[in-house]
């Protein structure tokens, strides 16, 4: 059996998680983008970093360019192992498709080349925006992916101790979001070669574990408990046999609660008594009387004919 969601978060906007430490506001995507969000990260108590989600693991997108803009505070943007600290005055940071990257909320001060107001920035909330281009593919970084990835990580950390790796790969596969192969190449290998090799291997590891192995074991990238636009999520998963086999669509035939309440009953107690309204279990006389009355009525009907 695959992963089973616990949290019900479909339709929530903003999406509030980790006891209010993170808010994700889904905004109307600008033309040509697959999504746009504004996230608010509340400051953590000193030393309270464990268990709080403060940024994704290193990853890459094959078909989408991602953009970041800080509204308040500062955020570290790591691209191919190089970290840049982004502030409101710095405008938009762009990460082209194919690059290994992540954003870092609690960025290490050693990466900051412009350290003014460090203490004030560290103590305040962080607000920043993210969007990505729309590649037109079935599996893209969009609201459906974000709702499910955020749902998986909350259920994993709140009700467990770690994220199911197969589920992580399946969800990442559904969002053009792949885990790079570990950086094990010698330092003399050019960065461009290293990125190309790590992304090639990382893509296939993510797809093989998430889609092929996970799909056969009952995993899927998206779950109804997390997903606002479930019909689109189903359409995405039906594009590959490995996920399609785990998706069922009987819910489309369901009658709404309003219609159920307004339905006229098509049966009554008489149906349970086979039309003998006066019949009582164990009351033979009443049954005989009901049968005789019915026979008499049938006789009258024949005379009338």
From Swiss-Prot:
Oxidoreductase; part of the gene cluster that mediates the biosynthesis of the bibenzoquinone oosporein, a metabolite required for fungal virulence that acts by evading host immunity to facilitate fungal multiplication in insects. The non-reducing polyketide synthase OpS1 produces orsellinic acid by condensing acetyl-CoA with 3 malonyl-CoA units. Orsellinic acid is then hydroxylated to benzenetriol by the hydroxylase OpS4. The intermediate is oxidized either nonenzymatically to 5,5'-dideoxy-oosporein or enzymatically to benzenetetrol by the oxidoreductase OpS7. It comes from Beauveria bassiana (strain ARSEF 2860). Induction: Expression is positively regulated by the oosporein cluster specific regulator OpS3 that binds the promoter at a 5'-CGGA-3' motif. Expression is negatively regulated by the global transcription factor Msn2 that binds the stress-response element 5'-AGGGG-3'. Disruption phenotype: Impairs the conversion of 5,5'-dideoxy-oosporein into oosporein. Pathway: Secondary metabolite biosynthesis. This is Oxidoreductase OpS7. Belongs to the oxidoreductase OpS7 family. The keyword Membrane does not apply. InterPro entries: RmlC-like_jellyroll, RmlC_Cupin_sf. It is an enzyme of class 1 (oxidoreductase). Its EC number is 1.-.-.-. GO terms for molecular function: oxidoreductase activity. The keyword Oxidoreductase applies. Gene3D superfamilies: Jelly Rolls. Keywords: Oxidoreductase, Virulence. Signal peptide: none annotated.
């Amino acid at each position: 059996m695959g992963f089973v969601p616990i949290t019900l978060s479909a339709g929530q906007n903003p999406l509030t998680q980790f006891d209010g430490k993170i808010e994700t506001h889904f905004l109307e995507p600008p033309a040509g983008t697959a999504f746009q969000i504004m996230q608010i990260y509340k400051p953590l108590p000193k030393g309270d970093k464990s268990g709080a989600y403060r940024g994704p693991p290193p990853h890459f997108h094959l078909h989408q360019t991602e953009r970041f803009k800080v509204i308040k505070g500062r955020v570290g943007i790591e691209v191919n192992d190089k970290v840049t600290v982004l502030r409101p005055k710095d405008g938009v940071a762009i990460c082209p498709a194919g690059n290994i990257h992540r954003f870092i909320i609690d960025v290490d001060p050693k990466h900051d080349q412009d350290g003014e107001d460090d203490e004030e920035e560290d103590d305040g909330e962080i607000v920043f925006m993210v969007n990505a281009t729309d590649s037109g593919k079935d599996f893209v970084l969009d609201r459906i992916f974000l709702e499910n990835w955020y749902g998986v990580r909350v259920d994993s950390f709140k009700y467990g101790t770690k994220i199911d790796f197969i589920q992580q790969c399946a969800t990442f596969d559904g969002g053009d979001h792949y885990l790079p192969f570990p950086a094990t190449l010698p330092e003399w290998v050019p960065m461009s070669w290293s990125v190309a090799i790590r992304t090639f291997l990382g893509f296939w590891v993510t797809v093989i574990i998430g889609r092929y192995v996970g799909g056969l074991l009952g995993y899927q990238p998206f779950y109804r408990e997390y997903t606002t636009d479930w019909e689109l999520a189903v359409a995405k998963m039906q594009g590959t046999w490995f996920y399609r086999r785990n998706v069922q669509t009987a819910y489309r035939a369901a009658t709404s609660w309003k219609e159920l309440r307004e339905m006229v009953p098509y049966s009554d107690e008489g149906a349970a008594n086979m039309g003998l309204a006066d019949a009582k279990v164990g009351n033979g006389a009443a049954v005989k009387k009901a049968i005789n009355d019915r026979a008499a009525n049938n006789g009258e009907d024949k005379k009338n004919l």
